[in-house]
Amino acid sequence: DGVTASLSHLTDPTAFMPHGITGFFAGFQIAIFSFTGIELLGTMTAETRDPQRILPKAINALPLRIIIFYLLSMVVIIAVASWPGVSAETSPFVTLFAKAGLPAAAAVINFVALTSAMSSANSGVFSSTRMLYGLSVEKHAHWQFRILSRNTRIPVRSLLFSCFCMLIGTLLLFLVPNVMTLFTIVSTLAAIMVVFSWGMILVAYLVYRRQRPDLHAGSIFKMPAGVVMSWVSLLFFAFAIFIMIFDPDTLLALLASPLWFIALWGFWKLKQRREGQLTLDNQSA
């Protein structure tokens, strides 16, 4: 198609940022969505036999993997195809190998992309299942969600409920026939929820640093400049939410997101009311 592979695409504004700085900022939403579940690294390694050894090793290896599999892959895509040559309807890796004259490799990469999507879905099911189980154990969710299977000791009912909720998501295709529009809306909603979760983690860390400095002093794996970087991250999250108002699809998701928090607040108040009624019944008995 006349595009010559060259590293000069990295410095050419029309190839590197064809939509200018506003397009670059608009990409923050999908970038946040792409790293959804990264917080599970601490959750899963904490459940291993030797978390004090495995957790630092896993976290220290993460930046290098992001550079290799995310940043360098983007460099290769831009160098070969440039952004204007990559269609939003096709995987950029498929486009890359197709332009290089390797259609078989493009098919393989397409298969890898599908398996990656399945892996991402599996991580989502794992996290939601574990969260439901934990909430049930703490008596913040229905007691049936903490029932374990006899053989595998897996919270089966939490797992089935998570899968059911994921299946409901496919019905959205009937409400929004355009796949890319639907993907933008859903990914934006997910990014907003992720920003909220990450923000709460950072706030909890700041409170922990202020209220329990003794525990932090005894930690063997401290975050360098943890307090400063927490505030920087919170400011970045606020900016990422702010720029969502400039795109119609992301704005729609942003306006709809309060409904989820209102629903959670309603369920919480209902739970408190039931607990209060049970307390009164027990006292009267």
Predicted regions and their residues:
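Hydrophobic alpha-helical segments and their helix-loop junctions in multi-pass secondary transporters
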Residues: 1-13, 32, 74-81, 198-215, ...
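Inter-helical loop and helix-membrane interface segments of multi-pass membrane transporters/permeases
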Residues: 2-24, 177-182, 248
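TM-loop-TM module centered on a large, flexible mid-protein loop between adjacent transmembrane helices
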Residues: 11-14, 58-122, 141-190
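Membrane-helix boundary/coupling elements in multi-pass transport proteins
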Residues: 30, 35-48, 106-143, 187-192, ...
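Structural signal for membrane-spanning alpha-helices in multi-pass inner-membrane proteins
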Residues: 74-78, 166-174, 202-209, 240-244, ...
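Transmembrane helix-loop boundary segments of multi-pass membrane transporters
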Residues: 91-94, 108, 171-201, 217-220, ...
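C-terminal membrane-solvent junction of multi-pass transporters and transport-like membrane proteins
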Residues: 144-152, 195-247, 278, 282-285
